[in-house]
Amino acid sequence: MIKKIALGGILFLLLAFIGLHFYFYFAAKKAFEDVKEESSALLLGNPQGDFLVVSFVDYQCPHCPTLDRILEKTLPSEPEVKILLRPVAWMGQTSEDIAALVLGAREQGKAAALHKQIMEEPKPPSYARAKELATNLGIDVKKAEDRALAAGLRPLIQKNSTIAVDIGLRSVPSLVIGGMPYAPPPEGIPGVNGLRLLFDEARTKALSPSPKTE
């Protein structure tokens, strides 16, 4: 009797493990499709580019501006790169407020400029400072806030966090380079040459034939 109970427990745990494995597999597969969607992202680089780089940033992250500047410096040498910047709000309400403001300003054609200004701040800005930067750029802040509300951008920003986690990314800044997740190592963020090497690695991996199964 005890042996049967033990075997039943082992079988239950095995089935649970298999179930979790498939759950995470399909969640990751869906996330890699969702990451290409543009409604919750800011489009940078070449809009028609055939090599997609997704950048996850948090506007309260002190390290995100460093990778953002390196990405910007990389673009002149990588004209085929299309960047989708996906803001997350892992560091609190201010992160979400600023992300909603930036995405809400897209229709005014100045969201990229606002993002750049925020990234150039000496420290992560308050929401009041972000609104000041937006106003200085000629952005109608009220209109951007209303647009964020009407378009349901805040839930989409929260979804960006889910996408990142399902892909396997747990920190910012982080990237998806041609379908390859990348989080900078503890020793530091790579420079322009290091980033271009990662681009080449992702291209090579994409061109490599999948191993045949017998």
Give the residues covered by each predicted segment.
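C-terminal cap of thioredoxin/glutaredoxin-like
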Residues: 1-16, 135-214
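Membrane-interface motif at the C-terminal end of an N-terminal transmembrane signal
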Residues: 17-31
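Short, flexible loop segments at the rims of nucleotide/cofactor-binding pockets, characterized by
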Residues: 31-32, 62, 152-153
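A short beta-strand-turn-helix
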Residues: 34-51, 75-76
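A generic local structural motif
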Residues: 37-42, 69-71, 161-162
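Structural alpha/beta surface segment adjacent to cysteine/selenocysteine redox centers
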Residues: 52-59, 65-135, 140, 170, ...
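Secondary-structure boundary/capping motif
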Residues: 63, 93-94, 156, 184
